[in-house]
């Protein structure tokens, strides 16, 4: 749910192949016959007040008729500031001040761009797109500007990165962990640790990632071929992913133990 005043308005990241998403983005943003073009001054009249011609908002330059959600966007409602303008940035930052209700998203991170993508999916599903607003994202000819092309590229990169993260989580699920002042800390693996259901348990290992300050605990498969090994590769050692170069054992924990305890 969108909340003004807090950063990180995530609907949850969509799990999809970047190539499919890129095609979808081009379908949303590419040339389309019959679309109405608004100038910002014209769009500002669509705030849902008495005598206004309608209740519209824009996201990444696309204009949506949000009349069916009037109670959320009409004058006096919590999100009335989004009506009659493109306030793309505020969908991520939650800054609903006049300074925050703007369309500049050039400095947002890849994760924040994915948040915008999810909001765009939400509006495409729940409201009717009635046109485009000229300015940052669309030119007077109705075609995407370089700024919108950059947004599309950032979203595609974010989707690729998200896909890789999900794949890594399947290979190296996070460990379960607990700590108490009486017993110290404990790390352990199960068939559902890290929220990843699987047919193996694994053993705790430290996973070192480039750029990360500290390793994190992951569960590592101990039998079968290494993940990603092709069928025509040389015979494996039946050690699963234990020999992955970015992994390290926990000092004081038996190599094949599914639980590592570290008393105080």
From Swiss-Prot:
The answer to keyword Methyltransferase applying to this record is no
InterPro entries, sorted? Cyt_B5-like_heme/steroid-bd, Cyt_B5-like_heme/steroid_sf, MAPR/NEUFC/NENF-like
Outcome, altering residue 7 to P:
In a colorectal cancer sample; somatic mutation
Question: Can you name one GO molecular function term for this protein?
Answer: heme binding
Q: Name one GO cellular component term.
A: extracellular region
User: Would the keyword rRNA-binding turn up in this protein's UniProt record?
Assistant: no
**What GO biological process terms are annotated to this protein in UniProt?**
neuron differentiation; positive regulation of neuron differentiation
What residue stretches are annotated with the Cytochrome b5 heme-binding domain?
35-134
- Keywords, ordered alphabetically: Neurogenesis, Secreted, Signal
* Function statement: Heme-binding protein which promotes neuronal but not astrocyte differentiation.
PANTHER family in UniProt: MEMBRANE-ASSOCIATED PROGESTERONE RECEPTOR COMPONENT-RELATED, NEUFERRICIN
Note on domains (UniProt): The cytochrome b5 heme-binding domain was proven to bind heme, although it lacks the conserved iron-binding His residues at position 73 and 106.
Any further remark recorded for this protein: Non-classical progesterone receptors involved in extranuclear signaling are classified in 2 groups: the class II progestin and adipoQ receptor (PAQR) family (also called mPRs) (PAQR5, PAQR6, PAQR7, PAQR8 and PAQR9) and the b5-like heme/steroid-binding protein family (also called MAPRs) (PGRMC1, PGRMC2, NENF and CYB5D2).
- Similarity comment text for this entry: Belongs to the cytochrome b5 family. MAPR subfamily.
Protein name (Swiss-Prot/TrEMBL): Neuferricin
- Top-down, what is the taxonomic lineage of the species of origin? Eukaryota, Metazoa, Chordata, Craniata, Vertebrata
């Amino acid at each position: 749910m969108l909340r003004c005043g807090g950063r990180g308005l995530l609907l949850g990241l969509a799990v999809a192949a970047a190539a499919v998403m890129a095609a979808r983005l081009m379908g949303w943003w590419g040339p389309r016959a019959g679309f109405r073009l608004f100038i910002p001054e014209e769009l500002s009249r669509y705030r849902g007040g008495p005598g206004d011609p309608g209740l519209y908002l824009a996201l990444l330059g696309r204009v949506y008729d949000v009349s069916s959600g009037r109670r959320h966007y009409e004058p006096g409602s919590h999100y009335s500031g989004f009506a009659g303008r493109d306030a793309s940035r505020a969908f991520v930052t939650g800054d609903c001040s006049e300074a925050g209700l703007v369309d500049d998203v050039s400095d947002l991170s890849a994760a924040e761009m994915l948040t915008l993508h999810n909001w765009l999916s939400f509006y495409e599903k729940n409201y009717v797109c009635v046109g485009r607003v000229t300015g940052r994202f669309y030119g007077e000819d109705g075609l995407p500007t370089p700024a919108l092309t950059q947004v599309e590229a950032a979203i595609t990169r974010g989707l690729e990165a998200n896909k890789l993260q999900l794949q890594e989580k399947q290979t190296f699920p996070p460990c379960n962990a607990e700590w108490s002042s009486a017993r110290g800390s404990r790390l352990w693996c199960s068939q559902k640790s890290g929220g990843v259901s699987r047919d193996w348990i694994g053993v705790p290992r430290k996973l070192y990632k480039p750029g990360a300050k500290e390793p994190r605990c992951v569960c590592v498969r101990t039998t079968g071929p290494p993940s990603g090994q092709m069928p025509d590769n040389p015979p494996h050692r039946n050690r699963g992913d234990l020999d992955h170069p970015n992994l390290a054992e926990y000092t004081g924990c038996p190599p094949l133990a599914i639980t590592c305890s570290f008393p105080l």
